[in-house]
């Protein structure tokens, strides 16, 4: 990135593909309506047995802290690929961490703290080739959840001025999302009595009304049930049902 001299930056993983007109479509869009800082496109998941198109659930432009909020709770795709960035977003003070998961998310969180204008185009421009070694197939344990959340919290505090005094709440948004991912994995052991989880519940209680604007009742119910070790089988059953529902909705939307 330090050697890049162009106006824009786009990312391509080594085993993925760009559609022939992806850069043309995205560069044409980034200058519209007074100019955007980021343009996002849809992508195609390519597996051995099938291909599937994934469209962003968000289509309206984002400004201010909207991109940060969406990135922290993963309501949009948080990858670096599938996006076109203005070069200057990567200048002056982006930290890079040797993480095995969430590297793209961490960069996008830091960029989001710069309050970019973001535009979404209804164009399938990126072909994501999924392999058994893909990062979303790697083990995700409680220790890594705690590590990642601590790094995010540190970055949010570093950008506290641009976050208008809401760094603590945005750190909570991230913790709820990442711990929910841990809880939703059936093989994850119960850790509801750990300090990280107890602090999470305490913060969630203080920001209960605010969290309702970002997370569903079902998501918050899972966190409440997770308080009790005996409820772990119920949590696993509910998360399985929610996962099936999400998968069905995606298939019907194609």
What are these regions (language model features)?
Residues 103-104, 168-172:
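Short, conserved alpha-helical segments within structured domains
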Residues 170-183:
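Amphipathic alpha-helical repeat scaffolds of TPR domains
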Residues 80, 172-174, 229, 242:
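Short alpha-helical segments used as structural interaction elements across diverse proteins
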Residues 185-254:
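Membrane-interface aromatic/basic loop that binds lipid-linked glycans or pyrophosphate carriers
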Residues 68-69, 153, 170-173, 197-201:
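Generic detector of well-ordered alpha-helical segments enriched in charged/polar residues
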Residues 158-169:
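Flexible helix-coil transition and linker loops at the boundaries of alpha-helical arrays
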Residues 1-150, 154, 158-159, 252:
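Nucleotide-sugar donor-binding/catalytic module of glycosyltransferases
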Residues 18, 162-163, 206-210:
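Alpha-solenoid repeat scaffolds
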